[in-house]
Amino acid sequence: MRVLYLLFSFLFIFLMPLPGVFGGIGDPVTCLKSGAICHPVFCPRRYKQIGTCGLPGTKCCKKP
C-alpha cells in the first residue's frame, strides 16, 4: 500500500507541466507584471503581442 503512494507521487511530479512550456501569458496580472499592457482587438503600432489577457480578443502587448 505504501508503494502506491510513492508511485502516485512520482507520477504526479513526472506528469506535472513545466512553467513556460505551454505558451506565454494568459491573464492580466501576469501581463502587467511583465511590463506589458492589455489592449483589445490588436496591439498598437510598435508593440508586439506576447500573450493574451484572459478575455477573448484581448491581447497582451509589449514594446520590443
UniProtKB/Swiss-Prot annotation:
Query: How far does the signal peptide extend, from start to end residue?
Result: 1-23
Q: Where is it localised?
A: Secreted
List the GO molecular function terms: CCR6 chemokine receptor binding; chemoattractant activity; phosphatidylinositol-4,5-bisphosphate binding
Q: Which organism is it from?
A: Homo sapiens (Human)
Q: Which UniProt keywords apply?
A: Antibiotic, Antimicrobial, Defensin, Disulfide bond, Secreted, Signal
In the record, the note on similarity to other proteins reads: Belongs to the beta-defensin family. LAP/TAP subfamily.
Q: Which intervals of the chain are annotated as region Phosphatidylinositol 4,5-bisphosphate (PIP2) binding?
A: 33-48
GO CC, alphabetical: extracellular region; extracellular space; Golgi lumen
Q: What cystine linkages occur within this chain?
A: 31-60, 38-53, 43-61
Protein's name in the database: Defensin beta 4A
